[in-house]
Amino acid sequence: MSKDELKDKKRKVEDEELKSKKKLKKDKKDKKDKKDKKDKKDKKEKKEKKEKKDKKSETESFAASASQSDIDEFLKENEVTVSDPSGSNIVPYLDFSQVSFIDQIQKEISKFPKPTPIQAVSWPYLLAGKDVIGIAETGSGKTFAFGVPAINNIVTSGDKSSSVKVLVISPTRELASQIYDNLIVLTDACGLRSCCVYGGVPKDQQREDLRRSQVVVATPGRLLDLIEEGSVDLSHVNYLVLDEADRMLEKGFEEDIKKIIRQTRSTSRQTLMFTATWPKEVRELASSFMSEPVKVSIGNRDELSANKRITQIVEVVDPFRKEKKLLELLKKYHSGPTKNDKVLIFALYKKEASRVERNLKYNGYDVAAIHGDLSQQQRTQALNEFKAGKCNLLLATDVAARGLDIPNVKTVINLTFPLTVEDYVHRIGRTGRAGQYGTAHTLFTEQEKHLAGALVNVLNGAGQPVPEELKKFGTHTKKKEHSAYGAFFKDVDLSKKPKKITFD
């Protein structure tokens, strides 16, 4: 063998040895990285478990400062019922001094006299990391009920990275905007970013906002569009809120909601639902992806009931005299000493609303309107003007009937009765909010006589007078389950462990 051949052979052997050493070194490094990754994951899980345990014990010790007699009186006065599958002995926060949120949040909530009932009862469970279903009348303070613990959790976790951690899904653009307006006060105070995502407006700014926000409020349709085009990552969401879930299903969003939930964490996610009513479809959906949820109910929810702080006046009228009667009512509720009182008028259909709007303007009234024939910009402007007091007369279809928090509405006028008595209760719930008193004046015609019995039940339940003309239509009502509203919450056993579901 020549010298050159020996050199080549030697070089090949050295190359093989070098490759072998490199491979060994790489395998060793990969093994170490894998071990480090596992240790890091185990450490993180251990830390999360400890934090959850500490959070629970802290929650219980703070709540314990309320006396049992005070708690009993509070539960009785507000007709509070709690169904907790785990049987944990958690008591409500009757005062802000009993709860320990971060300073920035404590400063914001202390501007209010005390927690509302839904806040007082749900906060201890939410701070203990439990899934919660909250059922309460509109105007109950549910946005802070779910928003305060959510934002507090982001800050205390120490992870302020720009990924979506809190997701609130809402049925309408108006309600989503309202929730966002409430939450941005807290996120700004805590140095976090939040955004509101809904349809009817360009996507460009929303895409940019989603990249930077930790808290997102969204309607299902637009959010799903952005998910499908790859503009939003929900894999870091650990706090999910479905607000007005019954309305979302009524609007046909069930499949969208399922697809959205699939994009979030399934194991470490805390899930909440806050609403006024619970149809069968939502109860079944809840049982599929909520983990042993605590059901918190404020007020008597066994039968449909109206806020007792609302004076209900029902007049039986000729259907052709309704608009003339409306002008008479506005002289009573919106002129002279009451000229600056906020009055909300409900029509049933958008064409009716357009006609009534023109008629009111013809008669000299400055009226804002929200209905389907208007653009999103026009609707938002109308709502903002009404909220700000620039225009104190608002005409709306049922798009504004659920969840919108418009402060200081003195009177609700039902020009046309809604399709269900449930919607009637939600409509009149725009007044008498946050402990205030209000008036609801309803025009009822023979065309709605099939709803007379159910309406009489609501009036009787709230201790309101029932006009003789209404009784003539009959007071018997057959107990049935409306297609959009369930009759019984407990049809689904929520104590069962959630099953793995497949989203098509």
Swiss-Prot record:
A motif (Q motif) lies at residues 94-120. It catalyses: ATP + H2O = ADP + phosphate + H(+). Residues 20-53 have a biased composition (Basic residues). Its main location: nucleus. Disulfide bonds: none annotated. GO terms for biological process: rRNA processing. Gene3D superfamilies: P-loop containing nucleotide triphosphate hydrolases (3.40.50.300). InterPro entries: DEAD/DEAH_box_helicase_dom, Helicase_ATP-bd, Helicase_C-like, P-loop_NTPase, RNA-helicase_DEAD-box_CS. Pfam families: DEAD, Helicase_C. ATP binds at A136, E137, T138, G139, S140, G141, K142, T143. Residues 325-474 form the Helicase C-terminal domain. Residues 1-65 are annotated as: Disordered. It is found in: Nucleus, Nucleolus. A motif (DEAD box) lies at residues 243-246. Its EC number is 3.6.4.13. ATP-dependent RNA helicase required for 60S ribosomal subunit synthesis. Involved in efficient pre-rRNA processing, predominantly at site A3, which is necessary for the normal formation of 25S and 5.8S rRNAs. Belongs to the DEAD box helicase family. DDX5/DBP2 subfamily. PANTHER family: ATP-DEPENDENT RNA HELICASE DBP3. This is ATP-dependent RNA helicase DBP3. The lineage of its organism: Eukaryota, Fungi, Dikarya, Ascomycota, Saccharomycotina.
